[in-house]
């Protein structure tokens, strides 16, 4: 009997191709047109998106991207490529492809790349440690659309999330310990996760529970008292309520209350990107210090660290 050949598809959100208003506009249009991201009535949303949001936000967001852009592209793309290459080296007999929900390389190009390698089975690993319908759900939807157009469909194993995976928690804990050793132990470790509208959670998205799971497991691995670890949510968009407490408002409050030293980690981001390097490491640092805080450090994402790559290898091994 012929042995099954397995390929791995690493999936992430995506990024503009360049830090220009035109490239950012193309990316935001695709991203904000996904009903998994914004489920507002199209009759109301299309005029607002095309007539107001894209013209106004694209130039401003392009400047933010330019402030963090790297020689090889956006940070998310650079680190995602490093993850793909490192995992391929770790698993030399297994094809590894990278696909993005929005922008390029697309999920479809990643699937085609694996099919060109004659794989019979694809393990899909969305690089979102905590499930949400707006991220992991978007990968699932697009994958289904892609495969619906194929005459032959490979076997699919879809990893929902890894919020409490032992290797993931240990990698986070070791990263925190290294930061504490370098900068000193802070008064508070703040874990900032990307937010979603509160309505999504009310309708059944278990994302906040998965974030709480990671927070609890990480605090336990570090042996930190509950009052020394706080969970917040960042990057809200629009006017409706999002998951709370909000990261920026919390940092302002903590600075005003006299908390002197904070370190911030974003466990939900598999790779550093605009939201971590600009929003958290820069904007929110200014918020905290401007409110009276004394010392603020951002703990980088796991990116392509050996521990994280080993976690990926172990995670997909159960499905190969």
Curated annotation (Swiss-Prot):
CDD domains: Ferrochelatase_C, Ferrochelatase_N. GO terms for cellular component: cytoplasm. It is an enzyme of class 4 (lyase). Its EC number is 4.98.1.1. Its main location: cytoplasm. It is found in: Cytoplasm. GO terms for biological process: heme biosynthetic process. One of its GO terms (molecular function) is metal ion binding. Coiled coil: none annotated. Pathway: Porphyrin-containing compound metabolism; protoheme biosynthesis; protoheme from protoporphyrin-IX: step 1/1. It holds the Pfam family Ferrochelatase. InterPro entries: Ferrochelatase, Ferrochelatase_AS, Ferrochelatase_C, Ferrochelatase_N. Fe cation binds at residues 194, 275. Keywords: Cytoplasm, Heme biosynthesis, Iron, Lyase, Metal-binding, Porphyrin biosynthesis. Disulfide bonds: none annotated. It catalyses: heme b + 2 H(+) = protoporphyrin IX + Fe(2+). Monomer. Belongs to the ferrochelatase family. Catalyzes the ferrous insertion into protoporphyrin IX. This is Ferrochelatase. It comes from Shigella boydii serotype 4 (strain Sb227). The gene is hemH.
